[in-house]
Amino acid sequence: SDVYKRQEPTILGGMKRVVDPRILGEEALFDILGFRIALEIGICSDIFRNITPEDISELEEIVKMGIVFENNEYAPVSEFTFHAKLYEITGNKTISEFQDIIHPVMIFVKNKFKDLLEPINIEMKEQGQIVTHVDLLNFLKNRDELGYRKAIEQHFEVYKRFLNSRK
């Protein structure tokens, strides 16, 4: 009977305990960042296969809240919530669990390397290359998987340029 069945440990449970961005070396931080970018691009087809009108409504609410909080300390919450919802849509619990691990790393990287990321962001903004959550949401609403795939890659371009400049 299931009553005596032990709770199965989560696949990333151990990783969650050891991934502390304050004690990780730069190479490990950059590897995690690169993994996150690859994961975001890799889950595109699952998102489009599983997304419901309710999911789109929820993402619309998240995006609205993100705009409200854009310039203060709530911005990371908006970032987390938007991408956590995308991970949830895949239906894969391990992917969702990864978001809990990667979020503190992303905040740490953004803060630690702010002076290096900012000029890349400014350059991309001047060239009209910034892809926002609003842009991503529009591709989802329009069921444009190819457009979304290109847009999510561009959404993380600032980090890709940053990582390439560190090699």
Language model: regions and residue ranges:
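Conserved amphipathic alpha-helical segments that form helical-bundle/coiled-coil interaction surfaces
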Residues: 32-114, 132-135, 147-159, 166
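Short helix-capping and inter-helix turn/linker motifs at the boundaries of alpha-helical repeat units
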Residues: 126-128
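Short, Lys/Arg-enriched, disordered terminal segments
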Residues: 3, 165-167
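Short linear motifs at protein or domain termini
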Residues: 1-38, 45
